Structure formats: structure tokens, C-alpha cells
């Protein structure tokens, strides 16, 4: 009897071990598959890319933060063209888009965009839709569709690379982006930075370019502009920004790289000073009386989460800034984005002109 019981216990233990092993292997292969797809997408980036943006929608969908972000983004419920696309193709980017990489290449005054997306496509339906809304042509081994839509006033081309992968480009030659195999020097420059961001489902890597400084200045919030900060950012060779969901929050990490230790030190000191200045400003008694308490609390949470570090990687010197974006901050940002600007509100003129006196009033004064 005891022997039978021992065998049962041994059988249960063996079964549990086998199930656990199978689960671990499945998880391992699933992660390897996602990592392999990500790596392969990034290897297709054109060699002359200036900026690369990567988004893993599958990983983001598993996080509560995506729901918060989706609720924050304004939606157009009357986008008839997109609704027609969904009806005709059965493809919805909210549900079926898995991964996408976008490469931006600057050539002086000309900017080219090349994007590759992985998703659950019904290829026949999608190609039929493109055929109805554009013209098809064979470019090498690719059947490309020239769409009626444009990007930067240039024709937009789209082609299936496989049943699950599609490419978009505004190059004159639609196969130029896919056919341009990056060199070893390209991989040597970009891959270490891609690998550092391997745990982030959302990131952008930017190689220094004269247009980047202008774009960063244009994107400054609230019209904020600092010549000193612009000059320091202009001395960075690389900038990377990554986001990683953590429950209903998003951890954002921005890093600037340069070869000059002095530039890294000056940038770190400037950002530390800016952080301290912002914290002191929010604690100013006069500002606290004027400011919405919830808005102030959201900004304070953001600033308290900030961490600024200097990193030494041999010849490369980096400054890293980490922040945590909370649902409370998104709510405040949404309210701020929909608020009516002060210069558009109806206000009486500062020096209202008196109405001209009528002839009757003039005659009365003479009397």
C-alpha cells in the first residue's frame, strides 16, 4: 500500500515537473520569437536612416497603461475612410497591428520615410483595397501599390514583403528602402543602442542631424526655449527615448550621448538645475494659490519621479533622465490640450474707444 502511494506521489511530482518545464519552454520560445521578429525588423532599417522609431503593440496591449493612453488620445469617430478600410480589409490597427518600425532619413531639405509593419493581414483583401485606391507596379520581386494618399507631397508606396509583413515608403523607387542592405558600420553604430533598449516595447533612436535640433525646439512645451539647452543638445551625437509600461504607468527613459565629457557634465548640471527650479516654482505660495491643486500634484509627482544620471561607457559619455508618466498626469495633459488659449478668449479691449458723439449730443453741448 505504501509503495503504491509512493508511486502516485512520484507520478504526480513527475507530471508537475513536466508541465512546469513545458510552460517555461513555451514562454522561452514565445519571448525568443518576439525578440527575433523585433531584431529582424530593425535589421531592415535603411542604411542612411537619421531616426528609428519602434513600437511593439502586442507587448503594449498586455499592459493597463495602453488603455490609459488610448483613452487620452483624441479620437475621430467620424473617420469614414478608416472605417471603410476596416470594413473592406477586416484589418483594425487597434486589434491586428503587432509591431512597426519607422525610419526617417534626412537628405538636406528632403526627408524620406520608410516603415515596416507586422500584423494579422488578410493579404487578398488588403491588396484588393490598394488596387482600388491606387495603381500597382512590379518593382523587382515586390508588387508595389502607389496610393492616392501622399506623404510630404510625395507618392506613398506600399508592398507586402510576406503575408504578415507590409512596407510603406515615400521613396521614388519603392524597393529602394527594402533593397538597401545596411553596412557593417551601420550595424556597429545602431545595434548597441537597439540592444540597450531590448526591454522597451516603445523607443526612438536619433542620430544627430541639423534638422533634429530644430525639431526638438519646435516640440518644446509651452513655447519654452533655452539657447543654452539647444546648444548642448546640438552637441549630442545620439539621442534615445524609450517607454516601458509598469502597471498603469509608463516609465520613460531619455538618454543623450556624446564624446565630450565637458558637454555631458554641463548637460547634467543644466538639467539638475532645471529640475530644482521647477520644484521650487511649484512650491511657491503665490503659484499654489492660483494653480489647480490636482494639476500641481500631478506635476509634483512627475518631478519627484525624475532621476538624472551620468553614465561613462568608455569613449562615450551619456546623460540619462528617467520619469514616470501616471494616469493623473495624462488626465491633466488632456485637460490642458483641450483648454481654450488665453489669447482666444473673449476679453474687452485694453483701451476701448469712446463712441463718436452724435450730431444731437453736439448740439446739446452748444446750448
Regions found by a protein language model. Give the residues of each.
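A short, solvent-exposed beta-edge/loop patch
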Residues: 53, 152-183, 244-249, 309-330
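Solvent-exposed, non-transmembrane alpha-helical starts
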Residues: 124, 176-180, 264-267
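A contiguous, surface-oriented mixed alpha/beta subdomain in the mid-to-C-terminal portion of proteins
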Residues: 209-270
